[in-house]
A protein has these predicted regions:
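Acidic/polar-rich alpha-helix caps and helix-coil junctions
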Residues: 2-180, 202-365
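Outer membrane beta-barrel transmembrane domains
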Residues: 183-185
Length: 365
């Protein structure tokens, strides 16, 4: 609830900046305006992922989206649009930012960072053609390249720097409050061993994969710095999966092997004919379109799970691909993850203030 309210406060601030800087021609105004459009787009992307049901091509014009708030007006009570309207509005924010040709790193949100978020948005909304186009643009023209094995651990566990293939990341200054928070979180996350199903993905020789030593100690405890990052590895993985959904399995496999060669010492390229059969008992059994997982898609999911560990990705992968249900026992009680729980509830304060606002399924106040 607090995060939901905090995001809307940021949208409000962005709208104030946008309203007051539109039409100004100075470089400072353009840079600030591009940053405001970018931040607003990211806010809507996060609202879309967390407070809307996962994308469904057949229901995108019916499922509730996020209210469009285009101006600062404390008296307005906008209702939720559709999922498709939210996608289009969010993409519009990124396009508005790109139209200002942002290049000054002072404002953080430069062309390639904005395009990376736009690719994430298209990928989440199963717009495979757009996701492929943007990912290729970033890979071919941004100047970023996959960090090789030799530089991976330094890149992935850098304390402050966005080094190597990292386009942008959290915790980029040495604020004492942030230092304390990240130290606390790293300690907390190191108190539980990683899931055995994740460890098994590394096979019989896990040390050959540079990600293993960069992420785990001998007791399977996490040692990876828990940061939010936008990296070229994610762009490559999105490109691979987009190509898969577009029917270009050869291209999907080619990009997957490109990533593996930069992560696994002596990696042998995967071949379509010899990919392992789909495992039984995995959480994800269907893809984003509801189709059964195939050996190639399983291979893409496996590399993504290893690559994006501790970067806030796994929950959204589960939500995007079928919202699997499962249960655990804790202190003698059974806790079940239901499908509806993948979508967070709209803030009760907003519902009370605006009774016409539709609550997400499964939640009753």
């Amino acid at each position: 609830q607090l995060r939901y309210e905090s995001i809307w406060e940021t949208v409000r601030d962005c709208n104030i900046v946008i309203e007051n800087l539109k039409g100004r021609n100075s470089e400072v105004a353009a840079g600030t305006l591009a940053a405001a459009f970018s931040i607003k787009g990211i806010c809507y992307f996060n609202l879309l992922r967390s407070w809307c049901q996962p994308w469904d091509n057949d229901l995108a014009d019916e499922l509730p989206g996020i209210p469009v708030v285009d101006v600062f007006d404390i008296t307005a009570k906008p209702l939720r649009g559709t999922l498709r309207q939210t996608y289009e509005y969010t993409d519009e924010q990124f396009r508005n930012a790109l139209a200002l040709n942002p290049s000054d790193k002072t404002y953080i949100f430069t062309e390639w960072i904005i395009k990376a978020y736009r690719a994430r948005l298209a990928f989440w909304c199963c717009d495979w053609d757009r996701a492929e186009e943007i990912c290729r643009d970033i890979i071919e023209n941004s100047g970023y390249s996959l960090t090789p094995i030799s530089g991976y651990e330094a890149m992935i566990n850098s304390k402050y720097d966005a080094s190597g293939e990292v386009l942008v990341r959290s915790h980029i200054n040495n604020s004492s409050e942030l230092d304390w928070y990240f130290s606390y979180m790293k300690g907390y996350l190191s108190s539980r061993p990683a899931c055995a199903s994740l460890i098994r993905l590394y096979g019989d020789n896990p040390e050959a994969d540079v990600r293993y030593a960069a992420c785990f100690d001998r007791k399977r405890m996490n040692v990876k710095t828990p940061e939010c990052k936008v990296r070229l590895s994610e762009i490559v993985l999105m490109l691979s999966e987009s190509l898969y959904h577009l029917g270009d399995e050869e291209g999907a496999l080619r990009w997957l092997n490109e990533l593996r060669r930069n992560r696994i010492e002596g990696a042998e390229d995967l071949a379509a004919a010899t990919l392992p059969a789909v495992r039984k008992g995995d959480r994800i059994v269907v893809d984003a379109l509801g189709n059964p997982v195939t050996p190639l898609l399983q291979a893409i999911f496996d590399e993504r799970r290893k690559e994006m560990f501790m970067e806030g990705d796994r929950w959204f992968e589960l939500k995007r691909n079928g919202r699997p249900e499962w249960w655990v026992i804790s202190n003698g009680l059974k806790y079940t993850t239901r499908k509806y729980l993948y979508t967070a509830p709209i803030s009760k304060d907003d519902i009370d203030l605006n009774p016409g606002l539709e609550q997400n399924p499964g939640y009753v106040y």
